[in-house]
């Protein structure tokens, strides 16, 4: 998530230009998350940057938060980011499922990221890193606290 105003359509007077706010400096946070499309159970952590060590930390925390169930496969749908493919990753009780190249839309969590950005970050600019973190935490907690809404966003309709 960044402090870049998300563009939307708006009406303006003919011949005038709409003002688009910007801060002039770059503030960024990375969210790594997992969602169960059926139950809406959602887990995420916020980082300043992502690499294989950070991703391993996230996997370790996810493994503690989502315990294994006998007879249940736990799939992690992943894009082809370099840190997803490091040979030394400990997957715990999860099974990685890599998407074909250039097809992130097949990942259910991508719909959640789009909704989160639309609902919480359209037309909003973070003034500080703390502002961004507060807004981001509020947005993530909303989806954690409303699993039925999260499931409806992320589930595949048949």
Short names for language-model regions:
Residues 1-56, 60, 156-157:
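Extended, low-complexity cationic-aromatic segments
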Residues 6-8, 88-91:
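Short amphipathic alpha-helical segments
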Residues 110-158:
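C-terminal anion-handling pockets and recognition modules
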């Amino acid at each position: 998530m960044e402090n870049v105003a998300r563009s939307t359509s708006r009406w303006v007077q003919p011949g005038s230009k709409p003002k688009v706010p910007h801060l002039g400096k770059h503030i960024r946070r990375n969210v790594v998350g997992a969602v169960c499309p059926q139950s809406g159970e959602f887990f995420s952590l916020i980082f300043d940057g992502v690499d294989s060590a950070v991703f391993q930390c996230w996997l370790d925390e996810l493994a503690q938060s989502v315990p294994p169930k006998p007879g249940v496969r736990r799939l992690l749908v992943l894009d082809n980011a370099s840190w997803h493919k490091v040979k030394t990753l400990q997957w715990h009780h999860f099974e990685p499922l890599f998407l074909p190249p250039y097809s992130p839309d097949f990942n259910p969590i991508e719909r959640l990221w789009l909704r989160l950005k639309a609902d919480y970050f359209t037309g909003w600019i973070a003034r500080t890193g703390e502002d961004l973190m507060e807004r981001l935490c509020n947005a993530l907690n909303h989806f954690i606290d409303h699993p039925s809404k999260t499931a409806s966003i992320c589930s595949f309709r048949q």
